[in-house]
Structure formats: C-alpha cells, structure tokens
From Swiss-Prot:
It is an enzyme of class 2 (transferase). GO terms for biological process: cellular response to growth factor stimulus; dTDP biosynthetic process; dTTP biosynthetic process; nucleotide biosynthetic process; thymidine biosynthetic process. Catalyzes the phosphorylation of thymidine monophosphate (dTMP) to thymidine diphosphate (dTDP), the immediate precursor for the DNA building block dTTP, with ATP as the preferred phosphoryl donor in the presence of Mg(2+). CDD domains: TMPK (cd01672). This is Thymidylate kinase. The modification N-acetylalanine is found at residue 2. It holds the Pfam family Thymidylate_kin.
Length: 212
C-alpha cells in the first residue's frame, strides 16, 4: 500500500499581508499535532537563480520584464524534485508564495496577459489548498518595511490584487479567502482548520498538475 502523501498548501496575498508569519505558525502547529510539515518560501533566494532574483527585488540590478518572469518560474521549477520527494514522504509543505504570485506580479505590468504569464508554470505540482490572505492595501502599506523591495508601491499592489482576483475565479483550484485584518491568532485558527481539511483530502488522491 502506498504511503499517504503530504498536502501542498500555498499562502498568497499582497505584500505585507502576513504570509510569512502565518506560514511559520502553521508549520509549528501542524508539527506539534503530529504532522510532518515544512515551510518553503518563493523566491528561493539561496540558488544561483534565486540570488539573481534577490538582487533584482532589492533594486540592486535591472532585468527585462519577460526575462525576470521566466527566472521566477525557473526558480520554482528547480524546487520541484524536492517538493515531490517531500510530499511523497508524507511531509506537508507550506509554501510562502507560489506560481500565483509570479503570474499576478507580472500580469500587473503593462502589456502582459495572464495567459502568457501562466504558461511557464503549467505542469508545476498543483496545490491542494491556496489560502489568500485578504488585506486592504492601505493596511498592508502601514505594516513594517513596506516599500523596501521592488513592487511595494500602492499603485502597483492594486493591480496585483486585481490579477489575484481573476486567478481566484478558476473553479478547479481550491482557493480559500482569509480576512488578514483579524488578529494573528484568529487568522491562524482559520488557516489551521482549512489546512487540516486539505491534509486529510490530499492523503486520498494523487498530486495534480497546475493549469493542466
């Protein structure tokens, strides 16, 4: 009998919505309750591609928009062997951003269609659950360190949010919207409940492929 696979859970949202905080809390809580769980963050900045992206995000270098979109996708693809291996070992993975951020942030730029933006990520491991942390842009901008990295401007984040809203219309993906303006503990409780459901369901079905 095949061992139960772990769930692939993604945290998405505009910048400073609390994804990293909630990802860490979720992994800690899942491990405390007997699950095997780990956190991965995208971009994964330790690889050669990731270092290039880190320099770009910190505004130290400039890259052409099409090229940088493909690099973000490549950064996800280079983690696919690890993701699949962990899931097959029964480890639940919590991802701080994934392909949806890649599509939304490029789609927010001029002259990019969402269809074009999706293409490089077609076939990535399909998440069992995507948690969108909903936060008013003014509230996000008021949170610490907003504006330090590229893309952290109110005007651009508004366009990003519109792209996310279009992505959430897809019926074959398991999106759950969470009100991130609530207290950290309230948000965590809701995320935890959705995640426990996803873990139970993932154990009964094979891993899918994104946008296929």
């Amino acid at each position: 009998m095949a061992s139960r696979r772990g769930a692939l859970i993604v945290l998405e949202g505009v910048d400073r919505a609390g994804k990293t905080t909630q990802g860490l809390k979720l992994v800690t809580a899942l491990c405390a309750s007997g699950h095997r769980a780990e956190l991965l963050r995208f971009p994964e900045r330790s690889t050669e591609i990731g270092k290039l992206l880190n320099s770009y995000l910190e505004k130290k270098t400039e890259l052409e928009d099409h090229s940088v979109h493909l690099l973000f996708s490549a950064n996800r693809w280079e983690q696919v062997p690890l993701i699949k291996a962990k899931l097959n070992q029964g480890v639940t993975l919590v991802l701080d951003r994934y392909a949806f951020s890649g599509v939304a942030f490029t789609g927010a730029k001029e002259n990019f269609s969402l269809d074009w933006c999706k293409q490089p990520d077609v076939g990535l491991p399909k998440p069992d659950l995507i948690l969108f942390l909903q936060l008013q842009l003014l509230d996000a901008a008021a949170r610490g360190e907003f504006g330090l990295e590229r893309y952290e401007t109110g005007t651009f984040q508004k366009q990003v949010l519109l792209c996310f809203q279009q992505l959430m219309e897809e019926k074959n993906l398991n999106w759950k919207v969470v009100d991130a303006s609530k207290s950290i503990e309230e948000v965590h409780k809701e995320i935890r409940a959705h995640s426990e459901d996803a873990i139970r369901n993932a154990a009964q079905r094979p891993l899918g492929e994104l946008w296929k």
